Amino acid sequence: MRTYISGSRRLSNIFWALTITLGGLGFFLNGCSSYFNTNLLIFSDASSIAFIPQGIILMFYGTVALILGLFLCLTIIWDVGFGYNDYNADQITVYRKGFPGKNRELNLTFPSEVVKSIKVRVTEGLNPRRQLFLCLKDSREIPLTGVDQPAALNKIENEAVTLAKYLNVFLETE
């Protein structure tokens, strides 16, 4: 039994990456327009803005936004967070993709005998969370759900019950 976890390639992440990048480009070009006393933007005239202090601040904010937008775009391209959970009778594998480097891929494999239970953690409030954890006998808790929008409560409960029955372990709630 295999379940896939969505990574950072979501519509909301793409929206924010484009919004921050385009906004940062506008701020940066606005600051450059005030420095060169020429209009680099089609939709506004920024050449009349004083370079010190307004233009320099616009360039700073634009640079920060462009760097943040680049980070978000690279996160989407690399699909950070994507992975799967693979459950077999003899072993359980948790695989996730991360940022490039030495530890780009996280691949955890556990024998089924070390699994103590499946835990459901539901947190309501301003930042609601509904998570599944694989609890091991040595008190480690391995998260099995992604970080996208919280799933419906009955969906998480059904997934937890199905998984606990399949692995023949207890089901805990918190």
Swiss-Prot record:
TM regions (residue ranges): 11-31, 56-76
Origin superkingdom: Eukaryota
Example GO biological process: photosynthesis
InterPro entries reported for this sequence: PSI_Ycf4_assembly
Membrane association type: Multi-pass membrane protein
Compartmental location: Plastid, Chloroplast thylakoid membrane
Keywords recorded for this protein, A-Z: Chloroplast, Membrane, Photosynthesis, Plastid, Thylakoid, Transmembrane, Transmembrane helix
Statement: the UniProt record of this protein carries the keyword Phosphoprotein: no
Cellular component GO terms held in the UniProt record: chloroplast thylakoid membrane; photosystem I
Stated role: Seems to be required for the assembly of the photosystem I complex.
Family: Belongs to the Ycf4 family.
HAMAP family, alphabetized: Ycf4 (MF_00437)
Name this protein carries in UniProt: Photosystem I assembly protein Ycf4
Organism: Emiliania huxleyi
Gene: ycf4
